[in-house]
Every structure is written in structure tokens, then in C-alpha cells.
């Protein structure tokens, strides 16, 4: 039985969405159990609508919940030992749950998770990994906003963790990995990116196949399974892609309804447009994973619908079911055992210069 703790107060439309998402998941995952955390007078009436969850869940009332506008430090100070988010995370720490899912404030979720669960001994810093729809299938992109800036060693950590997540979700023995850069040539990019590329080429880590540098336009193509970058550029890439998807949808909707002929064309092509809409639907690939922590924590989009929240729960389930933490820990340990040797062998002349 895989136990999922759920902060049912975090999202824009919670607790309805979180509980409805759990009800969807239980239809196709038989060995799952939920621990719901939230304000009793708000959550109990919603739970009554879903009797299918009665035998596979337990509700725990909390004093408060974390608001979307709270700063991480404020949320941690106010929510520790009180909020639904804190208790959902603490359940993982105490071994009462195997994974935590929340649609709440990202900064607060990261701060509470970091404070409560601590880091894996082998990881230098956390990262948020997101599932990205591509022309080929799906890719994983990380870090998409946990921290700003990263050293070469930290970028390699992200590569190892991202590859582990891809293996857990898609059962690919050796996912392909690329470092996001301003060009594919080895001489281009910042020092830390070039240094990380050198390490990944030399170390030949088990469980991933390093393909070199990739550019921004390679993300949507699905050129590699895992795209690695630091949180600043990763978050910009994510927000740009989301904005572009909305822009395309609005332009198409306006164009297809501009005249009788275009409306007729839309009617005749509606199946193709439905396929396009489903492919670009963020709820289909909802569920960012907070990697590097000593526990599995999943971040759902705050605006996700029930199907989207169900997707986030499924991601958490797969992470646990496939032993993500043990595999990542072993992979990181192998890298760090050889790290000093690799750094000593670094060719400073070849790696010099930080200009584009």
C-alpha cells in the first residue's frame, strides 16, 4: 500500500479539486491510501460527496492553511505545526506517508519541505523538476525555479536526479540528458555549464546518457529526455512556454471563429484541434517533483483541475513505487565518490572564459 498525504487547502479551487483528484486516481490505482489535511468545516462537507474514498483515506483537521501570498519565511513561521501543508509534509518525515502532494504556494512548500525533511546526504541543493510535453513524447526539465544559479557539481546533481525521475516515470533504462546552453558547441556558454558538460562526458554515470548541450528550441522538440539548467533560466523557459501555449490557443480560437468559412473549417477539423488541445493541456502533465530532499514531495499547479491533481498524485505514486529515493541516492553517491578526481583532472585552459 502506497500512502499519499495531501494538503487539500493549497490550490486555487481546493479542497474540491484535491479530493476529486484523489477520487479519480483510486479508480485505476488499487493499492493507494490517502491522508487528507485541512480545515475541518471546509473539508468534511466535500469529503461526504466522495464515499468511494471512505475506506481508503483518513482526514486530519488542522488549525490553518498556507496562503498563496505568504512569503516562504512567513509561511514557515506561521504554519509550522499548524498548517495543512506542514502536516502533509511532516507525515512523510514521520513515516506515516510515502509521498506528499500539494497545490499550494511553491516557495512555502520548498521552504517547509527543506526545513522538515532535510536534504539527501548526497545532494548539494534541491531542484524542482517538471514534465514538459514535446513533439516526441514528454521530457523532464529541471531546475524550474527552486534556486537561482548553480555550480558545475550542482548541475550534475540535477542531471542525476532528473534521469532518476525519468526512469521512474517512463521506465527507460538510460534516459538521454542535455545541458541547456546558448549553443551546442563545446566552447560556448558560462564556465560552470562547460565544466558540468566536461564532468558528464568523463564520468559516464550509470543510468543516464549525456548528449551534450541543447538549446531552448530543443526542449519542445524532445531532443533529449532530460534537460538540465539552473532555476533562473529554467523558470523563464517554463513561463515562456506556458505563455506561448496560451497565446497560440487564443489566436487559433479567434481565427477559427472570425467568419462562417473559418467556423466551418473548425467544425470539420475539430478532432485534430481536440488532439492539439489535449497535447498542450498543462493538467495532463501536472506534477513538479521537489528533488534532492529526504522524501517525495509533489507540487501541483495551483490552478489545476481534478484531472490535473490526479496526475500529480500519480507522479508521487510512481516515484514511490519505483524506489526513486534509493536509486537517486545510489547514483549521487557514485558521482560524488569520483568528483574530486574529476575536478583535479579539469583542463583549465579548455574551460577558460565565460563569454558567449
Curated annotation (Swiss-Prot):
Reaction equations catalysed: a fatty acyl-[ACP] + phosphate = an acyl phosphate + holo-[ACP]
Annotated compartments: Cytoplasm
GO biological processes: fatty acid biosynthetic process; phospholipid biosynthetic process
Gene3D superfamilies: Isopropylmalate Dehydrogenase
Coarse class of the protein's main subcellular location: cytoplasm
Record's GO cellular component terms: cytoplasm
SUPFAM superfamilies: Isocitrate/Isopropylmalate dehydrogenase-like
Any one Pfam family match given in the protein's UniProt record, by short name: FA_synthesis
UniProt entry keywords in alphabetical sequence: Cytoplasm, Lipid biosynthesis, Lipid metabolism, Phospholipid biosynthesis, Phospholipid metabolism, Transferase
GO molecular function: phosphate:acyl-[acyl carrier protein] acyltransferase activity
This protein's pathway: Lipid metabolism; phospholipid metabolism
Enzyme Commission number(s) of this protein: 2.3.1.274
UniProt subunit comment: Homodimer. Probably interacts with PlsY.
Protein task: Catalyzes the reversible formation of acyl-phosphate (acyl-PO(4)) from acyl-[acyl-carrier-protein] (acyl-ACP). This enzyme utilizes acyl-ACP as fatty acyl donor, but not acyl-CoA.
Family: Belongs to the PlsX family.
Record HAMAP family: PlsX
Protein name: Phosphate acyltransferase
Biological source species: Bartonella tribocorum (strain CIP 105476 / IBS 506)
Gene name of the encoded protein: plsX
